[in-house]
Amino acid sequence: MSETAPVPQPASVAPEKPAATKKTRKPAKAAVPRKKPAGPSVSELIVQAVSSSKERSGVSLAALKKSLAAAGYDVEKNNSRIKLGLKSLVNKGTLVQTKGTGAAGSFKLNKKAESKASTTKVTVKAKASGAAKKPKKTAGAAAKKTVKTPKKPKKPAVSKKTSSKSPKKPKVVKAKKVAKSPAKAKAVKPKAAKVKVTKPKTPAKPKKAAPKKK
């Protein structure tokens, strides 16, 4: 039996690696500014709570916290803020401390501060109404602009009138020139040159001599 030679196997080709895609760096996000909490600040809430109370001796810290909690303010988390707000209001002169020292005590609204608070409320309302009215003006101005824009395409009509009138002028001028030119040619007649004819003078005939008498 004839031995069959083993068939050589082709060298294993290594699979091509796909080109590594470059990682695109994402742009760093800009630091988002912290949003201020919507609504009045702690000091404003304290002033409102003290002004609403009818106690002549002043509002205690416990009573103030109750009124703030009823308004929906988180008293437990913002306990330190309430104390700082009370101290700052006392230092500014908006609140007067009738009893105790520091944050622990009773507080009453200063009469001068009451007049200032009323004026600030009026100015805030006026600013809010002015800000609300401004967008109406801009909307009206935008409407006027949109109305005025379609009037511009009417201008080409004037150019059509001028173009229709312009060809009439050369026709009139040409007609006049053609009418005048033959008249001039007829009026001018060439003058014939006058030639003077000199007549030849005939010689004088000799007179016959008279016969002499015998």
Curated annotation (Swiss-Prot):
A molecular function (GO) held by this record is: structural constituent of chromatin
Q: How is it modified after translation?
A: H1 histones are progressively phosphorylated during the cell cycle, becoming maximally phosphorylated during late G2 phase and M phase, and being dephosphorylated sharply thereafter. Citrullination at Arg-56 (H1R54ci) by PADI4 takes place within the DNA-binding site of H1 and results in its displacement from chromatin and global chromatin decondensation, thereby promoting pluripotency and stem cell maintenance.
Major location (coarse): nucleus
Repeat listed as a keyword: no
Look up the record and give one Gene Ontology term from the biological process aspect.
chromosome condensation
Tell me the ranges covered by the H15 domain, including all copies. 38-111
Modified positions (Phosphothreonine) in chain numbering: T202
Q: Does the keyword Methyltransferase apply?
A: no
Composition bias type Basic residues, residue spans? 20-37, 145-179, 186-214
Give residues where N6-(beta-hydroxybutyryl)lysine occurs.
K36, K54, K66, K87, K92, K108
Q: Which residues carry this modification: N6-acetyllysine?
A: K17, K77, K92, K121
The record's annotation in InterPro entries points to: H1/H5 (IPR005819), Histone_H1/H5_H15 (IPR005818), WH-like_DNA-bd_sf (IPR036388), WH_DNA-bd_sf (IPR036390)
Give the modified residues of type Phosphoserine.
S2, S12, S43, S67, S106
**GO cellular component terms, A-Z:** cell surface; chromatin; euchromatin; nucleosome; nucleus; vesicle
Function field: H1 histones bind to linker DNA between nucleosomes forming the macromolecular structure known as the chromatin fiber. H1 histones are necessary for the condensation of nucleosome chains into higher-order structured fibers. Also acts as a regulator of individual gene transcription through chromatin remodeling.
Which proteins does it associate with, and in what oligomeric form?
Answer: Interacts with DFFB.
The domain section of the record reads: The C-terminal domain is required for high-affinity binding to chromatin.
Entry similarity comment: Belongs to the histone H1/H5 family.
Q: What's the protein called, per UniProt?
A: Histone H1.1
Task: Give the originating organism.
Answer: Rattus norvegicus
Q: What's the gene?
A: H1-1
